[in-house]
Amino acid sequence: MQTQHTKVTQTHFLLWILLLCMPFGKSHTEEDFIITTKTGRVRGLSMPVLGGTVTAFLGIPYAQPPLGSLRFKKPQPLNKWPDIHNATQYANSCYQNIDQAFPGFQGSEMWNPNTNLSEDCLYLNVWIPVPKPKNATVMVWIYGGGFQTGTSSLPVYDGKFLARVERVIVVSMNYRVGALGFLAFPGNPDAPGNMGLFDQQLALQWVQRNIAAFGGNPKSITIFGESAGAASVSLHLLCPQSYPLFTRAILESGSSNAPWAVKHPEEARNRTLTLAKFTGCSKENEMEMIKCLRSKDPQEILRNERFVLPSDSILSINFGPTVDGDFLTDMPHTLLQLGKVKKAQILVGVNKDEGTAFLVYGAPGFSKDNDSLITRKEFQEGLNMYFPGVSRLGKEAVLFYYVDWLGEQSPEVYRDALDDVIGDYNIICPALEFTKKFAELENNAFFYFFEHRSSKLPWPEWMGVMHGYEIEFVFGLPLGRRVNYTRAEEIFSRSIMKTWANFAKYGHPNGTQGNSTMWPVFTSTEQKYLTLNTEKSKIYSKLRAPQCQFWRLFFPKVLEMTGDIDETEQEWKAGFHRWSNYMMDWQNQFNDYTSKKESCTAL
């Protein structure tokens, strides 16, 4: 006779048998971790995220390794592989010089590559939600780094939170940087230039051909990037071969019309000749030079890249995009002016203190270890470094506009003014101009002004809301369980992720439903933008309009002035006063118009 205890034991045993026999759901099957692409099968891995999982495929090859005779050439399509490729860890990073300015300092070390350096580096990563979606929106990340550095394997670019929370598929790719990615003999197929951009383009072609197998929608692809990554995104908007490869674009703190982004072909060729000279490859013809440069160890090329430009030049890019007649047929501002741009929706934005990240890398009087309270002389020396080749008159115009015109002069004013000069000229004003031109062509555009300084930022307080430090909120790092962001920052990051994903899915940051602050479309006339911070977002118009008008209209005229310096100086100062008075009147009238319009709307 069975006891009650025996019956209970048998019942428990049967329950365990049933549990073991039950299917655990599709997310736990081998089928979900192995996906067949056009070039072969890849095996991913399951990642725990926020109480759930995502499936990650890390280090999928998308091109032949650009080794030997393929160095300096466009990327070549991949051959099929017979076995299953293990895509379970990040691949090599592309060769690049490491930032050693502040050894051991997290603020700079976080951007250095965290995998082995190799020319065999053309790999991409895919994060997909669980359960595996059908026809999900795809977001493809392009990293920044001035076209000299960067890798997709950095923790700050981890796509798992975005995939898990917003149920989008996230993709990122490595592309060649520095001379190995952008050395150019324009017109020569053995070293045409823009190889790094062609890498990106081939990765986007891979996404088009394969993303459906991962549950993605090839007709809903948003490319997004920061700094040189944003400039890359805007170059794809100007490249007809890239048009079919994506749907929408997000540009964070960068654009291709910025003064650092694209070089004229003559300048690109001259820099290649200079590198050839320093590596002992000065030869009679281009092919001999290319052959010699291909024979060099990549480390030797890296060592000599830094000699291509003067040692005191800051914010200069040794090797970057150029007009090659193929990927890029003209300078970006010309193509924008001619309306030769993809019809699409774009989301663009900048951070409050874009210039500070560059000042600590050599500007006189600046340091990450103090308050960088600089003198007038150091401000002027800083202008000399950031504007080499600009006449004394041109630099005097900048000094007068950003400092003297305000009347107040103190170390803080000089420090903050140089931050504004560098940020306005290189990031903010070009981004606004790109957005304005894009909007003039009847494309929907949206603009943001990022105002939140991360509580975990290792850089000093005076550096403010720095270049690059919105990225951690876009990728959801504050949601991690073992991080010490504030609760407000976690909420803010979720809001940013929702906004970016809404834009990717629907072409509008508000998505299909309204929220507390409706994000207005940016038009070339009103130029409305939204502030992003942990408080309530606000709508404003004409971000830094007087400063950007100075760089767009007044500064070029000053550079053209010749003749007697005293007479010319008097002439530009008089012209400047007339111009600034006009700008102030215009700003006041516009503000009056805006307030009256909003009052009428509220009735």
Swiss-Prot record:
Matching Pfam families:
AChE_tetra, COesterase
MF terms (GO), sorted A to Z: acetylcholinesterase activity; choline binding; cholinesterase activity; identical protein binding
Q: Which residues form the signal peptide?
A: 1-29
Q: List the cysteine pairs that form cystine.
A: 94-121, 281-292, 429-548
> What's the source species' lineage?
Eukaryota, Metazoa, Chordata, Craniata, Vertebrata
This protein is called Cholinesterase
Q: Which UniProt keywords apply?
A: Disulfide bond, Glycoprotein, Hydrolase, Phosphoprotein, Secreted, Serine esterase, Signal
Q: Which domain of life is it from?
A: Eukaryota
Assembly: Homotetramer; disulfide-linked. Dimer of dimers.
Protein function: Esterase with broad substrate specificity. Contributes to the inactivation of the neurotransmitter acetylcholine. Can degrade neurotoxic organophosphate esters.
Any one GO biological process: choline metabolic process
Q: Gene name, please?
A: Bche
Main enzyme class:
hydrolase
Q: Which family does the UniProt entry place this protein in?
A: Belongs to the type-B carboxylesterase/lipase family.
